[in-house]
């Protein structure tokens, strides 16, 4: 039996593990961890071990589909592109929106946003970072001048204290959690702050179980203790930051006792957390969507930055503020400018439109475009057409009834994907893309490591790489000269020309290990740790912000007495499009549930595995109860992977005004037995 082994990168979370796809007679038959990969070091999690299983599913999209007489029917590429081209040319730029994709390559995202900006002349381009880590991009950007992980994954092992807040690392980033375990074995102290007693919390030396939405109260109280106990780094504050005195004044109110009343965390635990973090020579903060998906998401992130800066935990090994990105290329999609306010490399639209007009040899709109929530809010009125590439907002976005109404209000909905997702099912035109295993390109992982992916097998039927589809559409619209690429490598060469952080990167230089951006010249070895000498702000100083606690948009009340929070489980990934088509994942669990504390369940007369109705002001879902002491009393938890019991029917679309991220992590709910 002759087997081929094709080195590539896992398509799931943002860790960026190296894997070898096993190919026999043109078919994927297995996945092996890549033994020498610097990120995962020859290990994979359960999702990564079976990441090939969805690729050859029979229900892959193989031809374009066009809606005729209410039904989606097969069509030729020429017919589908002719229809789209004709429609697009009749819309004004502000009437068209683009949802780009954290699932797709850097090359796909670059070409997609370039099409929006050069052919359609709109900055209405966004992607799911809006829903997960837009608070990171804004918060870290304002604090340090760069909205990305400050340190590397391997660097976590150099910490004396690891402070994990709003991240279930052991289930959602298992190969990063492996680093946490190794650090703990060497004596590193672990602090975990989370409303759920997760597998991550079980590894903690100190666990703080807070009420959802009270992160700032707890963080401010920890900093209050640090100031009081003189555990701050006065030298670092003086030489590397500004804004400390204002923060210090704000912190006076946040005694551990005051924060305890807001958060439910015992005052003595807050004091112990402060002393544990503050006494470490090097302390690393890890966080995820448990602090970003709030109406205060940006301020939550900036509070973590405050904590790191006042203790001098920036710019050296084992320190930093380190967001763990949820998707394989959500970092790269942001880097590529798949956002309404920035071009590639986070270059602001108003200030840099002339630069990109020159680079692309065409005029571009100088105005900031619409975000995903704004496009959906204006659908059917200002926005007539939305083009979705590799996203599934009918399951992933909050208040799904509103999303469905918005998408059905459009004159034209184009969906480009590998399966007929819930979103594709309501589309007017569906275009079949290639999966990650069927194309060349690059992903950029959570630690800013740019890595090469390699084609292992052919796409099914007439499916085509996403960037090539966009190029074909541009050619159909008479704009092919703007997309004079024949290979993914040629796309990347243009990326390097217009993206300062990628300027020194080539496919050849990436090799197997990849490179950390910024990598600005061909001699630059890359930058695993940011902000070593100074921050990337205009004056080189880190910005400390005085931040007060604010309640979530929706609090539990007499009508909806429980607090609902949502998230993921280890066996599934986002909207389940891939993992629910993986036999090994589906065999583990393939239906939704709601976690309820035993005392709450007893009061409501609910038994384990009993059907219950969970309702909020936006809708209701019938789902199985899972009685567990791991959830805080008064709080219920639902995973959002399962379309038939969609948690996002219930979630609150209220947004952080600074980044427009929705408040997935907290809303008022009630649970009733059926």
Curated annotation (Swiss-Prot):
One Pfam family recorded for the sequence: Molybdop_Fe4S4
Binding site for [4Fe-4S] cluster: 10, 13, 17, 45
Reaction catalysis annotation: oxidized coenzyme F420-(gamma-L-Glu)(n) + formate + 2 H(+) = reduced coenzyme F420-(gamma-L-Glu)(n) + CO2
Protein name in UniProt: F420-dependent formate dehydrogenase 1 subunit alpha
InterPro entries reported for this sequence: Asp_de-COase-like_dom_sf, CT_Formate-Dh_H, Formate_Dh-H_N, Formate_DH_asu, MoPterin_dinucl-bd_dom, Mopterin_OxRdtase, Mopterin_OxRdtase_4Fe-4S_dom, Mopterin_OxRdtase_prok_CS
BP-aspect Gene Ontology terms: formate metabolic process; respiratory electron transport chain
Subunit structure and binding partners: Dimer of an alpha (FdhA1) and a beta (FdhB1) subunit.
Enzyme class: oxidoreductase
Alphabetized Gene3D superfamilies for the sequence: 2.40.40.20, 3.40.50.740, ADC-like domains (2.20.25.90), Dimethylsulfoxide Reductase, domain 2 (3.40.228.10)
Function: Catalyzes the oxidation of formate to carbon dioxide, with coenzyme F420 as the electron acceptor. In vitro can also use methyl viologen as electron acceptor.
Keywords attached to this entry: 4Fe-4S, Iron, Iron-sulfur, Metal-binding, Molybdenum, Oxidoreductase, Selenocysteine, Zinc
Family named by the database record: Belongs to the prokaryotic molybdopterin-containing oxidoreductase family.
PANTHER family attached to this UniProt entry: FORMATE DEHYDROGENASE H, RESPIRATORY NITRATE REDUCTASE
Note: The genome of M.maripaludis harbors two sets of genes encoding the F420-dependent formate dehydrogenase (Fdh), fdhA1-fdhB1 (Fdh1 isozyme) and fdhA2-fdhB2 (Fdh2 isozyme). The Fdh1 isozyme is the primary Fdh and the Fdh2 isozyme may not play a major role.
Traits of the deletion mutant: The deletion mutant cannot grow with formate and produces H(2) poorly. The fdhA1-fdhA2 double mutant is unable to utilize formate for either growth or H(2) production.
Domain 4Fe-4S Mo/W bis-MGD-type: 3-59
EC number: 1.17.98.3
Cofactor descriptive note: Binds 1 [4Fe-4S] cluster.
PROSITE patterns according to UniProt: 4FE4S_MOW_BIS_MGD, MOLYBDOPTERIN_PROK_1, MOLYBDOPTERIN_PROK_2
């Amino acid at each position: 039996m002759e087997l081929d082994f094709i080195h590539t990168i896992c398509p799931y979370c943002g860790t960026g593990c190296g894997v070898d796809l096993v190919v026999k007679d043109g078919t994927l038959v297995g996945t092996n961890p890549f033994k020498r990969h610097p990120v995962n070091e020859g290990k994979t999690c359960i999702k990564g071990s079976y990441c090939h299983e969805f690729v050859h599913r029979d229900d892959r999209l193989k031809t374009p589909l066009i809606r005729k007489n209410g039904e989606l029917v097969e069509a030729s590429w020429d017919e589908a592109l002719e229809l789209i081209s004709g429609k697009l040319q009749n819309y004004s730029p502000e009437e068209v929106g683009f949802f780009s994709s954290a699932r797709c390559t850097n090359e796909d995202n670059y070409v997609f946003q370039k099409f929006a900006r050069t052919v359609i002349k709109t900055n209405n381009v966004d992607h799911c970072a809006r829903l997960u880590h837009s608070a990171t991009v804004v918060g870290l950007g304002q604090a340090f001048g760069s909205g990305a992980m400050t340190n590397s994954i391997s660097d976590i092992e150099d910490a004396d204290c690891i402070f994990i807040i709003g991240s279930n690392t052991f289930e959602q980033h298992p190969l990063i959690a492996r680093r946490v375990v190794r650090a703990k074995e060497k004596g590193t102290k672990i602090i975990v702050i989370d409303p759920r007693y997760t597998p991550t919390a079980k590894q903690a030396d100190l666990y703080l179980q807070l009420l959802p939405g009270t992160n700032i109260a707890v963080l401010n109280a920890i900093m209050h203790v640090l100031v009081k106990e003189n555990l701050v780094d006065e030298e670092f504050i003086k030489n590397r930051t500004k804004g400390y005195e204002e923060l210090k004044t704000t912190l006076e109110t946040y005694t551990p006792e005051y924060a305890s009343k807001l958060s439910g965390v015992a005052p003595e635990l807050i004091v112990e957390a402060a002393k544990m973090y503050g006494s470490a020579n090097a302390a690393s903060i890890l966080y995820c969507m448990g602090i970003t998906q709030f109406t205060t998401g940006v301020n939550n992130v900036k509070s973590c930055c405050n904590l790191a800066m006042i203790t001098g935990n920036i710019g050296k090994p084992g320190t930093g503020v380190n967001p763990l990105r949820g998707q394989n290329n959500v970092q790269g999609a942001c880097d590529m400018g798949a956002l309404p306010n920035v071009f590639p490399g986070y270059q602001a639209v108003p200030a840099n439109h002339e630069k990109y007009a020159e680079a692309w040899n065409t005029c571009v709109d100088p105005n900031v475009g619409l975000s995903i929530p704004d496009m959906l809010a204006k659908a059917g009125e200002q926005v007539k057409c939305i083009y979705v590439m590799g996203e599934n907002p009918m399951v992933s976005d909050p208040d799904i009834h509103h999303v469905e109404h918005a998408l059905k209000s459009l004159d034209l909905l184009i969906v480009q994907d590998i399966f007929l997702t819930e979103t594709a099912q309501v589309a007017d035109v569906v275009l079949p893309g290639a999966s990650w295993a069927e194309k060349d390109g690059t992903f950029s992982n959570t630690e800013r490591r740019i890595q090469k992916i390699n084609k292992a097998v052919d796409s099914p039927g007439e499916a085509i790489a996403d960037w090539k589809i966009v190029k074909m559409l541009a050619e159909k619209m008479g704009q092919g000269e703007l997309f004079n690429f024949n290979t993914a490598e040629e796309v990347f060469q243009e990326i390097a020309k217009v993206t300062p952080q990628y300027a020194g990167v080539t496919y050849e230089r990436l090799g197997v290990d990849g490179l950390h951006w910024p990598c600005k010249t061909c001699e630059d070895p890359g930058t695993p740790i940011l902000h070593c000498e100074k921050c990337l702000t205009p004056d080189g100083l880190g910005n400390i912000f005085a931040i007060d606690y604010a309640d979530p948009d929706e609090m539990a009340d007499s009508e909806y007495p429980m607090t609902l929070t949502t998230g993921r489980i280890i066996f599934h990934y986002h909207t389940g499009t891939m993992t629910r088509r993986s036999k090994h994942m589906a065999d583990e669990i393939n239906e939704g549930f709601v976690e309820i504390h035993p005392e709450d369940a007893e009061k409501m007369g609910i038994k384990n595995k009993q059907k219950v109705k969970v309702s909020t002001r936006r809708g209701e879902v019938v789902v199985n109860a899972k009685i567990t002491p791991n959830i805080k009393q008064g709080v219920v938890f639902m995973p959002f992977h399962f379309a038939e019991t969609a948690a996002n029917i219930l979630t609150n679309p209220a947004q952080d005004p600074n980044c427009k991220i929705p408040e997935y992590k907290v809303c008022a709910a009630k649970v009733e037995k059926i």
